[in-house]
Amino acid sequence: MSKYLVKRVLLAILSILIVSAITFFVMNLIPGGPFNKEKATSKEAQQVLEERYNLDKPVPEQYVLYMNNLLHGDWGVSLHSGRNIGTEISRKFAVSAKLGGVAAIVAIIIGVILGSIAALTRNKLPDRLIVFFTTLGTAMPSFVLATLLLLVFCLKLGWIPVWSSSNPNYLLPIIALAAYPMAYITRLTKTSMLDALNQDYIRTARAKGVHRLKVIFKHALKNALIPVVTYVGPMVAYILTGSMVVENISVSYTHLTLPTT
């Protein structure tokens, strides 16, 4: 087991290095840069800036310096604000983490409940309604849902105030972020629950006269949650990456996104 974990960790580190190298070198192939000639900057000023940010050095050397600074906690300085990027992220990550954490909890709780209901009412009205809405949830991107929620509930109906730094409202961003993982967990729970209910140990428990609720919650649901637990990791990654887009639509300048100007 320890050898397997070490192997997986080493592969993860290797993957990160490969992805970072590819991203770095591809970005350097793109024409232009932060101090290109399109800006009203003299050649002397451009040269000073390039020396300051090590852009005058060969690209392989730039990458080595970049990784060395990164490993030492130096993430560089933001060209927009002039402040340290690590400080900027730590200051603004709280809002993104709060939205993502609440969205993940909501998605898991509601998804498991709806999936269980759909499994227990298979081919009946509740099951069909749940299948319909989960299909919408998996088909609609989070940024589209965030835009629709903002237009309907904030601008058209005026039921919910638009996000501001003085009056934050987490409801719509949380709904938009939780919609897809909640729908996926619902379908995952339903499939796992139906499979668990058809197992021999469930039939044995029923034959022994075990109460129906005990069979469902103690035996069937406990085993049906195993696939849901394995999905938590990818779900958190999805929510954190999607939160930047959703926040850019729903939230003001206090979120963890770069300025659009």
What is each stretch, according to the model?
Residues 9, 45, 49, 59-75, ...:
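Hydrophobic alpha-helical segments of integral membrane proteins
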Residues 2-3, 90-126, 142, 165-256:
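Alpha-helical transmembrane segments of integral membrane proteins
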Residues 9, 13-26, 101, 105-109, ...:
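Generic alpha-helical transmembrane segments of integral inner-membrane proteins
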Residues 56-112:
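An internal, D/E-rich "acidic patch" concept
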Residues 257-261:
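A short, hydrophobic C-terminal helix/tail in secreted or cell-surface proteins
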Residues 131-183:
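Generic hydrophobic transmembrane alpha-helix motif, especially the helices
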Residues 15-64, 158-172:
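Hydrophobic alpha-helical transmembrane segments of membrane transport/permease proteins
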Residues 23, 27, 31, 118-119, ...:
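Membrane-water interface at transmembrane helix exits
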